[in-house]
């Protein structure tokens, strides 16, 4: 549960994988041990201190990564990182009736073959163990009441909130932190208006077609980032 972060000001700081707190001192660890001990009150503090002193804590790098279906803490390139993915609250139910959702997609997209294609893609991303994205983006256009919002909400419920990144418009795809927009299973952009051949169009095309990308986030050097998110664009324009 606890990982070593760093030494600062004469204190050792720890990260708690359960709460996400990253500035815990040894006293916090002592307090958590009190609830799991059966020795007398007089020995309580000394025993807790001894346990912490004799424990080797794995060092963690606090830059989180996104790894679906893996533990709260994952190892990558010999380093331990917090995992942003969380298991969705909604569980698969073989007895559930999928017809309302299929009918909704059929009406939204105009025909059954298009709905079937989208459903196959959703099933692949849900069942995939390695989170490798197909180099396919979706562009849904239509006026109010078209059903785009219902689809986005359903996606969030099925895959879990941690798997879906929702942004207001395409400006988020070109900000200094845009690389983080792609570190999910799905990225949903509302109010898109992109013209073929434009700078935004070419940037989106590049990101959709790649699985890793070199970028310089604010305060960081250039380095390689995984970008597993598949893009869904909603628009009122054809």
Please identify what each model-predicted range represents.
Residues 177-182, 216-234:
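AAA+/SF3 P-loop NTPase mechanochemical coupling elements
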Residues 4, 161-166, 210-215:
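Short secondary-structure junctions
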Residues 193-194, 236-238:
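Conserved nucleotide-binding/hydrolysis micro-motifs of P-loop NTPases
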Residues 127, 160, 209-210, 236:
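Residues at helix-coil transition
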Residues 70-188, 195, 200-201:
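P-loop NTPase catalytic core of nucleic-acid-dependent motor ATPases
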Residues 1-109, 113, 179-181, 213:
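N-terminal nucleic-acid engagement/recognition segments and initiation subdomains in replication
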Residues 201-223:
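Conserved catalytic/switch belt of AAA+ P-loop NTPases
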């Amino acid at each position: 549960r606890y990982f070593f972060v760093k030494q600062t000001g004469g204190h050792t700081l720890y990260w708690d994988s359960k709460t996400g707190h990253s500035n815990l001192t040894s006293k916090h660890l002592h307090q958590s041990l009190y609830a799991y001990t059966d020795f007398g009150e007089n020995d309580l503090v000394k025993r807790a201190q001894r346990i912490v002193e004799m424990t080797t804590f794995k060092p963690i790098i606090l830059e989180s990564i996104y790894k679906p279906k893996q533990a709260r803490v994952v190892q990558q390139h010999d380093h331990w990182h917090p995992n942003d993915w969380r298991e969705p609250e909604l569980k698969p139910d073989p007895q559930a009736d999928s017809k309302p959702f299929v009918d909704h997609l059929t009406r939204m997209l105009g025909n059954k073959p298009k709905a079937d294609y989208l459903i196959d893609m959703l099933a692949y991303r849900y069942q995939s163990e390695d989170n490798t994205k197909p180099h396919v983006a979706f562009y849904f256009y239509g006026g109010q009441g078209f059903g785009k919002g219902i689809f986005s909400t359903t996606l969030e419920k099925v895959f879990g909130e941690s798997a879906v990144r929702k942004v207001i418009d395409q400006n988020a795809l070109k900000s200094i932190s845009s690389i983080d927009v792609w570190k999910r299973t799905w990225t949903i952009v509302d109010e898109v208006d992109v013209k073929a051949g434009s700078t935004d169009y070419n940037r989106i095309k590049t990101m959709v077609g790649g699985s890793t990308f070199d970028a310089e986030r604010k305060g960081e050097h250039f380095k390689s980032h995984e970008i597993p998110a598949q893009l869904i664009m909603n628009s009122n324009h054809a």
